[in-house]
Swiss-Prot record:
It comes from Trichormus variabilis (strain ATCC 29413 / PCC 7937). It comes from the Bacteria. The gene is rsmH. S-adenosyl-L-methionine binds at G46, G47, H48, D65, F92, D108, H115. This is Ribosomal RNA small subunit methyltransferase H. The keyword NAD does not apply.
């Protein structure tokens, strides 16, 4: 069992050391200005937050994350900015957005490199670990609870809906036959054994979509995103901007329609901004990133002022 100091080492060094995706596009998209107040709703290790704070003088930033490890890393990364930064531990959907308080809001969705590369968090089948997948470790529901307790139909439904897995019924049947499962590798092996060889040895591991579905369900990710999209625009000042980075089609669809359907927002990106080939070569995580940006409309009666 790792000591507290060993865990801290992994948080501070292994972590959140990955490069922020679409860095210049985010700063430009938010139109960061001197004296502005910005919200990073998914601060992670603080990579994007640092760019925002460095983009103009006297910038203030509120850094939100539901993961205690992330906040530990972000506090170290952003320590030099002192009282310019306020840290809040919260899921971005549960955060109490102050009305008309921010010049820009950023959300970088999905799982970080840290979560995938830290075995004890249980997000990846590349490492043997307990089936966990909780972003907020204060919550009770884990991936093991879903896999071992939900019935076959429920499992098939979530694999299809949230993982877009075509073999969802077949995989769910095998899981129910073989459970209980305790580790990520046990589950991944059962999934691989349930699919035809052409899928088993394909470029994408057959467990990939199932693990995505489990992560989404355990963390209620899509419902949280819907709530965030409803609440966040109210926190922007007129002319303030919201920038959201998504990593898979389910997220991007919600972001696209959420921004478009908000009566208080004007969408600035007809198509999502994606990484350049140079960035992808330098930071492979950016390959699937899509950035959408919208601007808060002026209040009624302010348009001509």
């Amino acid at each position: 069992m790792k000591s507290h100091s060993a865990k801290s080492l992994s948080v501070e060094e292994a972590t959140f050391s990955h490069l922020p995706v679409l860095p210049q596009e985010v700063v430009t998209g938010l139109a960061v200005r001197s004296g502005g107040h910005y919200l990073d709703a998914t601060v992670g290790g603080g990579g994007h937050s640092r760019l925002i704070l460095e983009a103009a003088p006297d910038v203030r930033l509120t850094a939100v994350d539901q993961d205690g490890d992330a906040l530990t890393a972000a506090k170290k990364e952003l320590a030099e900015f002192g009282e310019q930064v306020k840290f809040v531990r919260s899921n971005f959907a549960a955060y109490e957005f102050p009305v008309a308080s921010f010049d820009g809001v950023l959300a970088d969705l999905g799982v970080s490199s840290y979560h995938l590369d830290t075995p004890e968090r249980g997000f990846s089948f590349r490492h043997q670990a307990n089936l966990d997948m909780r972003m907020d470790q204060r919550q009770s529901l884990s991936a093991a609870d879903v896999i071992n307790d939900w019935d076959e139909v429920e499992l098939a439904n979530i694999f299809f809906k949230y993982g877009e897995e075509r073999l969802s019924r077949r995989i769910a049947r095998r899981i129910v036959e073989k459970r209980p499962f305790h580790t990520t590798t046990e589950l991944a092996e059962a999934i691989a054994s349930s699919v035809p060889p052409k899928y088993r040895y394909a470029r994408i591991h057959p467990a990939t979509r199932v693990f995505q579905a489990l992560r989404i369900v355990v963390n209620d990710e899509l419902k949280s995103l819907e709530t965030f999209l409803e609440k966040a625009p109210k926190a922007l000042v007129p002319g303030g901007r919201i920038a959201i980075i998504s990593f898979h089609s389910l997220e991007d669809r919600l972001v696209k329609h959420g921004l478009r359907n908000s009566p208080s927002l004007k969408v600035l990106t007809k198509k999502p901004i994606i990484a350049t080939e140079a960035e992808i070569a330098n930071n492979p995580r950016s390959r699937s990133a899509k950035l959408r940006i919208a601007e808060k409309k002026a209040e009624m009666g302010q348009e001509d002022n």
